[in-house]
Design a protein with these regions (language model features):
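Intrinsically disordered, low-complexity regulatory segments
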Residues: 1-144, 214-215, 224-230, 335, ...
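Metal- or metallocofactor-binding catalytic centers and their adjacent structured scaffolds
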Residues: 222-257, 469
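C-terminal or mid-to-C-terminal helical accessory/interaction module adjacent to the motor/catalytic core
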Residues: 72, 117-201, 245-252
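Phosphate-interacting basic helix/loop segments used at nucleotide- and nucleic-acid interfaces
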Residues: 55-78, 178-179, 267-268, 375-384, ...
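A conserved hydrophobic secondary-structure block that centers on an alpha-helix together
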Residues: 82, 254-256, 260, 265-279
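Basic, low-complexity terminal or inter-domain segments flanking catalytic cores
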Residues: 2-5, 16, 25, 155, ...
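Conserved nucleotide-binding/hydrolysis micro-motifs of P-loop NTPases
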Residues: 11-14, 31-37, 83-87, 115-120, ...
Length: 611
């Protein structure tokens, strides 16, 4: 008979852990949270320090009964939910049901933590059990209470003022505001015309290359009309050019840190076109365990909710062995790369990485679904690249001018040649390409020329214009452009904006983005978010009634206070009160503001068509 009971959230996680442990252990799953606030009422005692009134979640009574029964049969209980706020809250609620506080002194109920589901990590955790971190429990409780207060009371107000079935959220409403604000910016935007002029030049050596007009009379080329563009074309057409200056420099491109949650969601959106929700679902599957042939259920990546880029020494050495063997010592830095941890990140956490660097994507491809494989490959490549040397590029900038114009017109071209690929041999970070909402300051803003291959050139060398089809004049092309409105958010851009403004936390981004779509406040059109009519109506009402609640700085400050609860520097009740006081004031304000339901059409003398 088992002497120890291990409790986790997920049946998949339970199966993977069972594989690594002997008969002395029994593993059970709580299948998520076992207790929560009631669905039928507020469930928070506003008069008694916001005391939450937890109840057993529907369908979980039998789960708890089974856990309690099994706990009576063993000597020790190990609570092993995920290593984050939600996991700590699950552990705490189960510990209470087992009549223990999760402290070592209870002699029976312990908390164990591991960031990866591997044999070594699990056995290491069981050898050094700890106690429930009440700071994490209180941080989760504070967030849950705040979200319930706003969701319950705020949504009731929306039902009264706008229409039934609507919801309000402490963070979701701010996310909707960002999308509505961006749409207003786009509607107010007025496009500006600008022109570019490109010369196709050739010297003594092939190939011919393009150069853009960079400056006129020493000032940035700012061509606002077609007439002005034609004046410049007339001044330079048919003239030979001369190379005025050549600037060469070596440039290093450093590797990027291994994934944290927000970066994984952004990159998966850019490169794989996954929604944050899909990314986190797949990552959870890879974390909890996939059947890998004879190995059985195997945890393939570390815990996927993290804001720390830290890598354990063991994992670092693991990566360095792979780099040395598969790429060569020239790709291996003399000392491991170390990445800075953000201010509020939990040092106990690690970055999202493979549990074994030796388990490359191709070696397990046959066991993974296509989406699982694509995400695992993204994580593996990023992790390996993070421990490689920088890429080295030779960057060349060439300025040339038409002969006889006294250097009045300077045309510039820039080319980059990769001298040593370094980490880019494995991984290149994606970008969020945005169309310009103003005139580019120079040609490199207007167009990326980094991959341009330049011929061998020397200062003073004569160049000539090369005629091609579809050119405005032989060797010259003028193009009309218009500045574009600020882009609508896609998943990657919205996550970046939420992160930069401190709204929500990486572990909540996926649910925020899913919720605002499920509520029909925003919709996706061609991969970009647009506010719906409902979203605009709700946002307009909330902006009038809840100016603080929808203020990004207020929301960010609230997140910082909740982080302080997690760090143990602020009582959770104090953090909730700091939010609740202005919330009550704004609720009173909003009650007096007319919503769509309050607006009644004035009576007319026209007969009713139905009467």
């Amino acid at each position: 008979m088992a002497k120890s009971l291990i409790i986790v959230e997920s049946p998949t996680k339970a199966r993977t852990i069972t594989k690594y442990l002997g008969r002395g252990y029994s593993v059970m799953a709580s299948v998520g949270h076992v207790k929560d606030l009631p669905t039928s009422k507020l469930g928070v005692d506003l008069e008694n320090d916001f005391e939450p009134q937890y109840v057993t979640i529907k369908g979980k009574s039998k789960v708890l009964a089974d856990i309690k029964k099994k706990a009576q049969e063993v000597d020790t209980v190990f609570l092993a939910p995920d290593p984050d706020r939600e996991g700590e809250a699950i552990a705490w609620h189960i510990a209470q049901e087992l009549h223990g506080k999760g402290k070592k002194k209870d002699g029976k109920v312990y908390r164990v933590l591991f960031n990866e589901i591997t044999e070594s990590a699990i056995k290491r955790a069981l050898k050094s059990p700890g106690e429930i971190d009440m700071k994490l429990v209180q941080a989760q409780q504070a967030r849950r209470v705040l979200d319930r207060i706003v969701g319950y009371q705020g949504s009731q107000l929306l039902w009264k003022k706008v229409r039934r079935g609507l919801s309000m959220g402490r963070v979701q409403s701010v996310a909707v505001r960002l999308i509505c604000d961006r749409e207003k910016e786009r509607e107010a935007f007025r496009a500006e015309e600008y022109w570019s002029i490109v010369a196709l030049l050739a010297g003594d050596n092939p190939p011919a290359f393009e150069a853009k007009l960079h400056s006129v009379n020493g000032q940035d080329a700012d061509i606002g009309t077609g007439e002005r563009a034609q004046q410049i074309l007339d001044a330079v057409q048919g003239k030979p050019f001369v190379v005025q200056s050549i600037e060469r420099k070596e440039k290093k491109r450093n590797p990027v840190a291994p994934f944290i949650t927000s970066r994984l969601q952004q990159e998966a959106a850019r490169k794989l076109h996954f929604s944050p929700k899909k990314t986190m679902t797949l990552a959870q599957q890879l974390y909890e365990g996939i059947e890998i042939g004879a190995e059985g259920p195997t945890g393939l990546i570390t815990y996927m909710r993290t804001d720390s880029p830290r890598i354990s020494q063991e994992a670092t050495e693991d990566a360095r062995v792979v780099i040395r063997e598969r790429f060569g010592v020239e790709y291996l830095p003399a000392t491991p790369n170390v990445y800075k941890t953000q201010k509020a990140a939990q040092e106990a956490h690690e970055a999202i990485r493979p549990t074994s660097a030796a388990r490359d994507p191709e070696s397990i491809r046959q066991y993974l679904e296509q989406d699982q494989y694509n995400l695992y490959k993204l994580i593996w490549n990023r992790f390996i690249a993070s421990q490689m040397v920088p890429a080295i590029m030779d960057v060349t900038r060439v300025d040339s001018s038409p002969v006889g114009t006294l250097d009045r017109y300077v045309f510039r071209t820039t080319g980059t040649v990769v001298k040593f690929a370094g980490h880019t041999a494995v991984y290149l970070e994606g970008t969020d390409k945005e169309l310009p909402s103003r005139k580019p300051k120079n040609e490199q803003e207007a167009e990326d020329e980094s991959d341009r291959q330049l011929p061998a050139l020397r200062e003073g060398e004569s160049l000539h214009l090369v005629a091609q089809e579809a050119q405005t004049l032989p060797g010259l092309v003028s193009k009309q452009h218009f500045t574009q409105p600020p882009p609508r958010y896609n998943e990657a851009l919205l996550i970046r904006e939420l992160e930069e403004k401190g709204i929500g936390r990486p572990s909540t981004y996926a649910s925020i983005i899913s919720t605002i779509q499920d509520r029909k406040y925003v919709e996706k059109v061609e991969g970009r978010f647009l506010p719906t009519e409902t979203g605009r109506t709700v946002n307009d009402f909330l902006l009038k009634g809840f100016p603080d609640l929808l203020d990004t700085e207020f929301t960010s400050h609230m997140e910082e206070q909740l982080d302080e609860v997690e760090e143990g520097t602020k009582p959770w009740v104090s953090a909730v009160r700091d939010f609740y006081t202005p919330f009550v004031r704004e609720m009173e304000l909003a009650q007096g503001i007319p919503g769509p339901k309050d607006i009644v059409e004035p009576p007319t003398n026209l007969p009713c068509e139905k009467c």
